Amino acid sequence: MRILLTNNTLSARAGSEMYVYDVACQLKRLGHQPVAYSPELGEVAELLRAAGVPVVSRLTGLDFRPDVSHGHHHVETMTALACFPGVPAVSFCHGSTPWQEMPPRFPRILRYVAVDLACRDRVVREANVPVEQVQMLLNFADMDRFLARKPLPDKPARALLLSNTAKHVDHAAADNYAATVRDACLSRGISLDVHGSTCGNPTSHPEDLFHNYDLVFAKGRTAIEAMAVGCAVVLCDLAGCGSMVTAATFDSLRPLNFGLQSLRLVNTVDTIAAAIDRYSPTDAARVRDRIRQEARLTDTVTTLIHLYEAVMHEQALRPADPSAELLATGAYLQTLDCILKGQNIKPATARA
């Protein structure tokens, strides 16, 4: 199967960029032919190429026609639909607020995938996509890469804050939550290291980094990967603080992607210290075992392959409707025009 994966950038290591990397590499391992497209290339594009996955920054003039498009971000998804007439697509929503994540409406987008409940609500309520076209597919970790660590100590000694939003702990800024996390850790006798692009200390190998720490402050897929290694995880980011992920809270936090909707508290020394106090090596091991069982990259890609096959089959049975596609393109361009002009309107939807 030939799969085109689109993303607004393939530069820095970030959420949807690494999602493309993990999925494309697994597809290739299974004998499929993934190609990644983004107008902005960089480090992640080079990682994909090193893994044998072709990467392009333009779709015109290619000696490649996909069987299906895996679409992240509406501009790139619509570009793929325009460049490859007759090819069906699956549109993915990875964020409940960024404008780039608003899923477009188009006749050949036959399924929509949301990575958590907030994204699902956005697809249904804001983009007006029928519920029967929407599937929630929760995030994952590559368990062959993020191997389980040795058992945690009875008391945590070393903590890691891993986020691209974190500043250096000594940076003088009102929103420097890294300094707040550091102070909370110090109040419990724990040292803290901060890694991420904003603080000038990025990491290329979090799978190795996690093994050096007992406690990790993170959100989203980073939190999932830390759990898979076996670290105790406190949900935390610039937006706020959540709880320690425990066996008791796992079921409520998993559909939220351990993400923004989980960060209900203000980042203060007291709230973060209270989360630290939930540390339990036994409980962290239970969380590790569950996430390793329920959030495997291999299972996710198997589900995606079935989804690709389903939309390809549906598209083969559908008559071509150029008029409907032109109407949908016009409605999309109207929406895009308003976005570019900074107007706050809901996406336009064409109806045949």
Question: Which residues does each predicted region cover?
Answer:
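A charged, aromatic-enriched C-terminal amphipathic alpha-helix characteristic of glycosyltransferases
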Residues: G15, P151-L152, L263-Q334
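Catalytic binding pocket for nucleotide-activated donors in carbohydrate/polymer assembly enzymes
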Residues: T222-R286, R290
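Conserved catalytic-core segment of nucleotide-activated headgroup transferases in glycan assembly
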Residues: R122-R125, D142-N201
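Short amphipathic alpha-helix
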Residues: S16-L27, V44, Y177-A179, L304
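Short His-centered aromatic/hydrophobic patch
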Residues: G71-E76, C93
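Acidic donor-binding loop of glycosyltransferase active sites
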Residues: D67-V68, D208-R221, G230-V234
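A short, active-site helix/loop in glycosyltransferases that binds the activated sugar's phosphate group
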Residues: Q100-E101, L110-E132, A172, N176
